[in-house]
C-alpha cells in the first residue's frame, strides 16, 4: 500500500486536514499522520511558545487547545518527524503549514511538499500578479508578513484575520472585506472546507483552501 506522510506543526489529530486528504487520496493510501508537538509536556509546550517579538504560527493540540508556536523552535521537531517517517518507509510527505521554515533537513529518499511553496505557486496559477488578492490568516500580527509576501509578488493585497479555531461569526464578518477580490487564499492549514464555504459565500469570491490544494498535488505524486 502507498504511504503519504502528513506532518502537522501541532499534535496529530483527525480533526483538521486528515478527513479532507483522505477524501482526496481515497482508501488505498496509508496516511501516516504525525505532529511536531506530539508527546510534549505542558512545560515543553511553553518552551516552544513564540516570543513577543516573533512571527508565530497557530496550531491545535490533541485536547483542542489552540497554541502560538515559535517557528525556529519547531524546525528541529519537524526534522525529527521527517526522519522518523523516512525510517518507516514513507517516500512522500506533506508539511501541512503555509509558513516558511529555515533549516529543514529532508532525509534521502523522502520527497517533501512544503505548504508555503505549493500554495504560493497555486496563487500564481489562478490569480495573475496585479490582481486584487484576499489573504486570510489566523492572527492580526501575521497580516504584515503574509500580506507583504504577496505584495512583493505583485498583488494588490487585502488582508483579514480570523482564528480557524474560533467562531464562525468572526470568520463570516472578516470575509466581507474580501468582496471584489479576484480570489482569496486561506493562508493556514487549519482552515477547512467549512471555512472555505463561509468565505466564498460571504465574500462572493473564489477561494483557495490550502489543505485541499496540498492533497490534490500529493495524490498526483504518490508512488
Report residues per predicted region.
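Short amphipathic alpha-helical segments
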Residues: 18-19, 105-108, 147-148, 196-200
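Short, surface-exposed amphipathic charged segments that create phosphate/polyanion-binding patches used
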Residues: 45-52, 126-134, 174-176, 221-223
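Conserved mixed alpha/beta catalytic, RNA-binding, or beta-rich assembly cores of soluble enzyme
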Residues: 92-101, 105-142, 148-152, 156-172
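N-terminal glycine-rich phosphate/adenylate-binding segment common to multiple enzyme folds
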Residues: 69-116, 184-196
